From Swiss-Prot:
ATP binds at residues 19, 61-66, 277, 341, 413. This is ATP-dependent protease ATPase subunit HslU. Keywords: ATP-binding, Chaperone, Cytoplasm, Nucleotide-binding. ATPase subunit of a proteasome-like degradation complex; this subunit has chaperone activity. The binding of ATP and its subsequent hydrolysis by HslU are essential for unfolding of protein substrates subsequently hydrolyzed by HslV. HslU recognizes the N-terminal part of its protein substrates and unfolds these before they are guided to HslV for hydrolysis. One of its GO terms (molecular function) is peptidase activity. It comes from the Bacteria. One of its GO terms (cellular component) is HslUV protease complex. Belongs to the ClpX chaperone family. HslU subfamily. A double ring-shaped homohexamer of HslV is capped on each side by a ring-shaped HslU homohexamer. The assembly of the HslU/HslV complex is dependent on binding of ATP. The keyword Repeat does not apply. It is found in: Cytoplasm.
Amino acid sequence: MHLHFTPRQIVEKLDQYIIGQKDAKKAVAVALRNRYRRSKLAENLRDEIAPKNILMIGPTGVGKTEVARRMAKLVGAPFIKVEATKFTEVGYVGRDVESMVRDLVETSVRIVKEEMVVKVQDKAEEQANQRLVEILVPSPEKQSGFKNPLEMLFGGAQNSNQTSDTQEDVEIEKKRQDVERKLAAGLLEEEIVSIEVTEQQSSMFDMLQGTGMEQMGMNFQDALGSFMPKKTKKRKLSVKEARKLLSNEEAQRLIDMDEVTQEAVYRAEQLGIIFIDEIDKIAGKQSNSVDVSREGVQRDILPIVEGSNVATKYGSVKTDYILFVAAGAFHMSKPSDLIPELQGRFPIRVELTKLSTDDFVKILIEPDNALIKQYMALLATEGIEIEFSDEAIRKIAEIAYQVNQDTDNIGARRLHTIMEKLLEDLSFEASEITLEKITITPQYVEEKLATIAKNKDVSQFIL
């Protein structure tokens, strides 16, 4: 965990991936730093301080989700994104709101498990190599298959065979040492071996996914799995692939699942972040009789956000200190349309601004994962170096902004459709092009995009 970052450092890290939205970055940076501050307090005072939940307001594609996701990734906190519209009021078929907490704990378990696996990786690989040696040079018992039953009962011929057995053991030990050296040197990577691996069985309870009954299915599955034998199957693989499978099996044996569960539940409770998207879609005091009550979903979310205990397969989880970040465009409604109790649970309000042409220019070139860098890297695999002139980048940004104004404003996501259309022919013909370097000019952008962008009827379907 990396909770030691200062708010300024967090904002600087977020600036590497997200353009603009300073207010949103500051809000999440302070929320993260307050978690660090809270961890330094005496226990009696620590229990009194709950995180201040955040409500992000802004149109689609301006970075609401990305700010929260990058924040969680930065500190290694368990993070999940859910859509408020996916939940239904208690009593209706569909996902209940408590499933978001169960999903968060599952994510936390996965993160902790991966960390534990990394810690035991060297030992697991060592044991996997030992198993490979035994597979490549099997012991005499495995080679001979079975012994004479009378010999096993009465010990006949034991003395006469003892010397030959000892010699055979020495021979096998020499062979194994030789194989160990070759494995360490990587000389047997393509050798084919037959190994037994635990079969991953698809559960009949998978059909319960999305019905709100997943927890019941998991409990049944755990109960059955405790006394049902695990199935194994033989697979023929190269030594390289077999080592990966065997290392994974050995790592699973080496880690203590009780320790994993304990740490995962602690992280989910104390450091977890739940991002509730499209919360504006359940705002509104009126509801049609044929629809599942949106206000009912809000009332179900309320106790989770306020702080309650949720039963999961890993035990009871407290939601008192989980940070909730809600987001919505609020085109058709406003934050005050949420029920007053829920409004009060999101004291920090942040409004994200619409993206300008200058923002689009920065998005195209500045972030570490900038869109233009991605396309340059993709086409470089075909031996083609493409570069964009500054004027061409400005032209792309202007067209993206104009199309957003003329049709639906989908923010930075518009750049993906614009870039795909711009480089469509080049991507199609890349494997046949003999040129090593191609420069994208404003004229090329104009030729590929301007006509479509100017025609409103066409652009709303293509761009």
